Swiss-Prot record:
Assembly mode: Part of the 30S ribosomal subunit. Contacts proteins S3 and S10.
Protein name: Small ribosomal subunit protein uS14
NCBIfam families per record: PRK08061.1
Protein species of origin: Desulfosudis oleivorans (strain DSM 6200 / JCM 39069 / Hxd3)
HAMAP family: Ribosomal_uS14_2_B
Bound cofactor: record note: Binds 1 zinc ion per subunit.
UniProt-listed GO biological process terms: translation
Database matches in PROSITE patterns: RIBOSOMAL_S14
Gene3D superfamilies attached to this UniProt entry: 30s Ribosomal Protein S14, Chain N (4.10.830.10)
Annotated residues for binding of Zn(2+): 24, 27, 40, 43
Protein's job: Binds 16S rRNA, required for the assembly of 30S particles and may also be responsible for determining the conformation of the 16S rRNA at the A site.
Name of the coding gene: rpsZ
Length: 61
């Protein structure tokens, strides 16, 4: 419940632009947000391993 309200609060336009921050739309996590994909690192890993992110492959060398 608290995390849901924080997601809603983060989506509103802040009084000052410096207060704006990104949250994962799936889990609501505020840290480790990957801007290119618009999700956090944990959701990124799970979606990439399921093959839901096109063009993302596990690196190997």
């Amino acid at each position: 419940m608290a995390r849901t309200s924080l997601v809603v609060k983060a989506s509103r336009e802040p009084k000052f632009s410096a207060r704006k921050y990104n949250r994962c739309p799936i889990c609501g996590r505020p840290r480790a947000f990957i801007r290119k994909f618009g999700i956090c690192r944990i959701c990124f890993r799970s979606m990439a391993s399921m093959g839901k992110l096109p063009g993302v492959t596990k690196s190997s060398w």
